[in-house]
Amino acid sequence: DEEVAHINSNAVELIKREADKAKACLNFESGRLNNEVVVSRMGTRDFKVKIQGVAAHSGNDPEMGRSAIVQGANLVIELEKLNDIKRGKLINCGLIKGGISTNTIPDSCEIGILTRYKTREIGEEILKDIKEVLSKTFVEGTKTEFETKVGIGAMEKTDEVMGLFNLLSEVNEKLGYKKLVPIEVGGGSDAAFTSEIKIPTVCALGVVGEFNHTDKEYAVVDTMYERIELAANTVYELD
């Protein structure tokens, strides 16, 4: 259920309800080999763009055609210019299809876009910017429409999150385990849902392993006890 963002259940509602007024949230995504703990995850929003043009024979009546693909190609160039990797503003036009044959000026084009953002503010900025780009007409006689929806919200790095990480680190040191390292990553997790309701959250506290989502995936079983001990003692130390 989690891997498809709980589209078939009310898990998100349950997570937020149960976490309401909690002091902190520890999320048990798989741990990392070098003791990294996730303090920030990017949010996602996808867009499905459909462009309608006018078909025509590319040899006999080229002047009658209005290429949806040319309109789409220009949009892709403009959309990709919006990327600002350093700020955590990512736009990927990852899918494009259109036309029916090489001797027909294409009257259809579809573009699939996935965006990622470091903060909710940047997410709103992306939405505004993409709407502005998609309102442009590069090929007269074409029409551009789109649908959009939020995937997983951003798990934002805040002072409260780093306070929770520091507590984890102190407990970890007392237990004699290797030093924890805070990292920020692009992939999402359920940690976003508790972050959204302002609960200090850290992620990737599960059993340590590698190669997720592949046939090489494995877990270092001995670390399961270490992570249980770390989580239990951290909860005990919460104010």
For each predicted feature, which ranges?
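Acidic/histidine-rich catalytic neighborhood of metal-dependent amide-processing enzymes
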Residues: D1-S40, D239
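Metal-dependent amide/peptide-bond hydrolase catalytic core
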Residues: S30-V39, D46-K50, V54-D239
